[in-house]
Amino acid sequence: MAIRKYKPTTPGRRQSSVSGFDELTRSTPEKSLLRPLHKTGGRNVHGHITTRHKGGGHKRQYRLIDFRRNDKDGVPAKVAHIEYDPNRTANIALLHYFDGEKRYIIAPRNLKQGTVVESGANADIKVGNNLPLRNIPTGTTIHAVELKPGGGAKLARSAGSSIQLLGKEGKYAILRMPSTEIRRVDARCRATVGEVGNADQINIRWGKAGRMRWKGVRPTVRGVVMNPVDHPHGGGEGKSSGGRHPVSPWGQPEGRTRKPNRPSDGLIVRRRRSNKNKKR
């Protein structure tokens, strides 16, 4: 995917870049696979803000994505189109199954229009094919990996992400995650061969605040510029730095937001590298 840069005709356009959309083959989605998507503005049923920095944005329709693919084992499908999806960073591929059904999947890198893909334990090791981890050779690059058998893909679904299958150990497969974490996953879980396409999406420069508003992202205001009634860092004379360790608006220390005792933590072989230990 190429990145298209604008001429600097305005201050916002000077910094902007957009996707070239070279991979896409159709601009209109499959109507039968669309569902309405209602905006919440980050509010719950009582109208209280539960997620900050959400609201507005362009109207969207949700594309139904098949994250399981386990009920189509042995049924080949032809890639009819590669399409844009406003609800995710990756592109999506429209499959026409030979039994007449149509479904969307996450579009892997180098998946072309007209390619035939399939799912099942006996599927070939080919980009776009979906099969259990125990049937995939060690060293293969995969994406859209399940955490529980039949639970649907949960891992490596965003643009450019991938997981490497390092080996197999009893009833588990050993995976290297995009975060560099190494963990065990039930070998009956399914994965799709290849890495997610649209990898250059990370290099897009939004250029101006308005483009983020189109996406439904509202501004993030720093606590130190608020009043004391609004944030623990607020108040002070002049540009004060807060005078305490960083906390949330409700006084919780920043960082360490992950639950420390998840049941699946016992399957982690090696923790992810912290930022200070990552190679530059």
UniProtKB/Swiss-Prot annotation:
NCBIfam families linked to this entry: rplB_bact
Stated family: Belongs to the universal ribosomal protein uL2 family.
GO BP: cytoplasmic translation
UniProt keyword annotations, A-Z: Ribonucleoprotein, Ribosomal protein, RNA-binding, rRNA-binding
Biological function: One of the primary rRNA binding proteins. Required for association of the 30S and 50S subunits to form the 70S ribosome, for tRNA binding and peptide bond formation. It has been suggested to have peptidyltransferase activity; this is somewhat controversial. Makes several contacts with the 16S rRNA in the 70S ribosome.
Subunit: Part of the 50S ribosomal subunit. Forms a bridge to the 30S subunit in the 70S ribosome.
Ranges of Basic and acidic residues composition bias in the record: 23-33
GO molecular function: rRNA binding; structural constituent of ribosome; transferase activity
Region forming the signal peptide: none
PROSITE patterns documented for this protein: RIBOSOMAL_L2
Pfam family, one: Ribosomal_L2_C
Annotated stretches, region: Disordered: 1-59, 223-280
Record-given protein name: Large ribosomal subunit protein uL2
Keyword flag Kinase: no
Entry's Gene Ontology cellular component terms: large ribosomal subunit
Biased composition (Basic residues): 36-59, 269-280
